[in-house]
Every structure is written in structure tokens, then in C-alpha cells.
């Protein structure tokens, strides 16, 4: 009975370790901020520029594109 409890305890600890490692894995996303080139820059321009710079022009990989003043914030899939 003691052996069974010991094996069960080790199995539970291993399951916990594996689940922690899975939650800290890379999500395949990145984010960055860059200065906009002119004042007429729109949110859509920000999204297109983010796609051009960081995803080889793939617009569907851009998750978030925000324009705040003279900065463009992008979050995208890598």
C-alpha cells in the first residue's frame, strides 16, 4: 500500500511539472512599437506597415494594431 501511494505521489508531481511547463511555453506572438512616418498615418496604415515589417506582408498575422499619437503598437503572430 505504501508503494502504491509513493508511486501515485510521484505521478502527481510529474503531471504538475509538465502542466507548468506547457503554460509557460512560447505562444508564437510578438509585439513592438515604432514611430509613424507622418501625421496622416491611420490605424489601417499602422496595420499594413506592421504586416510589411514583421510578417513578410501577411496581414492576417497582425493581431492588434493601435495608433497612439506618433507611435504605432503592433502585436502579431511569428
UniProtKB/Swiss-Prot annotation:
The keyword Disulfide bond applies. Its main location: secreted. Residues 1-25 form the signal peptide. It is found in: Secreted. Keywords: Disulfide bond, Neurotoxin, Secreted, Signal, Toxin. One of its GO terms (molecular function) is toxin activity. Expressed by the venom gland. One of its GO terms (cellular component) is extracellular region. Belongs to the scolopendra neurotoxin 3 family. This is Scoloptoxin SSD996. The lineage of its organism: Eukaryota, Metazoa, Ecdysozoa, Arthropoda, Myriapoda.
Amino acid at each position: 500500500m505504501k508503494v502504491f501511494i509513493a508511486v501515485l505521489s510521484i505521478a502527481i508531481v510529474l503531471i504538475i511539472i509538465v502542466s507548468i511547463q506547457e503554460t509557460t511555453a512560447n505562444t508564437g506572438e510578438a509585439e513592438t512599437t515604432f514611430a509613424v512616418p507622418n501625421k496622416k498615418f491611420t490605424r489601417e496604415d499602422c496595420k499594413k506597415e506592421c504586416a510589411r515589417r514583421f510578417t513578410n506582408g501577411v496581414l492576417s498575422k497582425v493581431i492588434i494594431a493601435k495608433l497612439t499619437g506618433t507611435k504605432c503598437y503592433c502585436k502579431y503572430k511569428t
